[in-house]
């Protein structure tokens, strides 16, 4: 049951009928839960039960899309042999499947659960190596496709030029989501506006869903979505951070409890046409549980209220 393979069209039809809930953060939650600064992707090989435990917590919270623990599993971010990076990717997908199967066996649940092969933007100086990045993303996607992945999430991207070869390679083989990260003013680290990012993603026929994750908290993401138009023919995603981190004893931590505020803003975002909601850095299974209990997941024709951009104060 945990290894059900879905077609691209099956996933699209399901989400068009009823809004759906992603999981929350993996990296920040893993670091806090196990009090470690170790790259969480290493746990796929070194501590697989920890990985499955977090996946199960999100399933119990009500998530129907699990992202694999592979966000930074690439040769630029991980200082391990390339063959181990490949195994990290494979294990990431397998562990999520095992977690779903174990959860089904324990609970008797039969609802559809989608496992998204998670690929994050490769940061830093590597971003200047466009050809090398494109090859890396293609290699990562090939490994996931060999493992039978039917759902991809490219997230926290500031642009998508280097992604296009991989996206075109996947084509009709899997459901494709691309999520961008912008700041509170609606611009990515590449200097592109949220509007331009959605426009470019909207022009790629292979992409099924577009949206935003990370970068900002729920209030700023809501304000950004208010002044944007949903790309025609695309599903819309929103996965903000819990808020903004603070430096505590040398670590960037998300402090305080703002779950109620987070859920309230997410309710407003789904009313704007968001089809796929969830959380990024700082969110936990508790956030997702509250979302599952309070969001209206019915799907209906969307009419977006447009807010005027805020005027700059003198």
Placement of each model-derived feature along the sequence:
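Domain-level signal for soluble alpha/beta catalytic cores
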Residues: 1-314
